[in-house]
């Protein structure tokens, strides 16, 4: 089976769904953010603070290139679609799944997730986060071969829909 790439805004469920989907398909799961932390040797918020978003996006692009050689379920960071080079890379995969949720649902998940510090959500208002989502939405849609709505759905329901659509 070819790689499956999960894209979507922060809080869409990419890591949660990626891990479970990989288990179901008996494939390795690669989380781009986790791999980036290992590569850069510090947390993403620390890296953002010290080097800025542009430097972070460069690291992200390099890692996406490296990981694209593996066959796995790949959970990406929410901003992976920002760079044109990344969008080209994403379009080269056969299975790119956009995990979509309403802005209200995303805000709820982001604010309730105390374990995950999201540098682009810290110290931003709800309105600013929604504006950020809206600025990326078309890029997610442009890169996706499949869109799955995750709003008010359990991980199991989402995975079952993905598996059903992969069979078709």
Curated annotation (Swiss-Prot):
Residues at which Mg(2+) binds: 15
Superkingdom of the source species: Bacteria
Co-factor remark: Binds 1 Mg(2+) ion per subunit.
Catalytic activity: shikimate + ATP = 3-phosphoshikimate + ADP + H(+)
Places the protein is found: Cytoplasm
MF GO annotations: ATP binding; magnesium ion binding; shikimate kinase activity
Entry keywords, A to Z: Amino-acid biosynthesis, Aromatic amino acid biosynthesis, ATP-binding, Cytoplasm, Kinase, Magnesium, Metal-binding, Nucleotide-binding, Transferase
EC number(s) on file: 2.7.1.71
Known cofactor(s): Mg(2+)
GO (cellular component) term, any one: cytosol
Residues reported in the UniProt entry to bind substrate: 33, 57, 78, 136
GO biological process terms held by the UniProt record: amino acid biosynthetic process; aromatic amino acid family biosynthetic process; chorismate biosynthetic process
Entry function: Catalyzes the specific phosphorylation of the 3-hydroxyl group of shikimic acid using ATP as a cosubstrate.
Subunit structure, interactors included: Monomer.
Protein name, as recorded: Shikimate kinase
Organism: Enterococcus faecalis (strain ATCC 700802 / V583)
């Amino acid at each position: 089976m070819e790689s499956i790439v999960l894209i979507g805004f922060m809080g869409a469920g990419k890591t949660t769904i990626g891990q479970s989907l990989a288990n179901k398909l008996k494939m390795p799961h690669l989380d781009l953010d986790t791999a980036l932390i290992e590569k850069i040797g510090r947390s993403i918020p620390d890296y953002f603070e010290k080097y800025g978003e542009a430097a972070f996006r460069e690291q992200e692009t390099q890692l996406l290139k490296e990981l694209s050689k593996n066959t796995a379920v790949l959970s990406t960071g929410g901003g992976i679609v920002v760079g044109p080079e990344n969008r080209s890379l994403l379009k080269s995969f056969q299975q790119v799944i956009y995990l979509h949720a309403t802005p209200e649902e995303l805000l709820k998940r982001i604010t309730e997730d105390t374990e995950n510090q999201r540098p682009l959500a810290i110290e931003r208002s709800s309105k600013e986060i929604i504006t950020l989502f809206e600025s990326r939405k078309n890029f997610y849609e442009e890169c996706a071969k499949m869109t799955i709505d995750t709003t008010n759905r359990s991980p199991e329901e989402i995975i079952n829909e993905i598996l059903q659509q992969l069979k078709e």
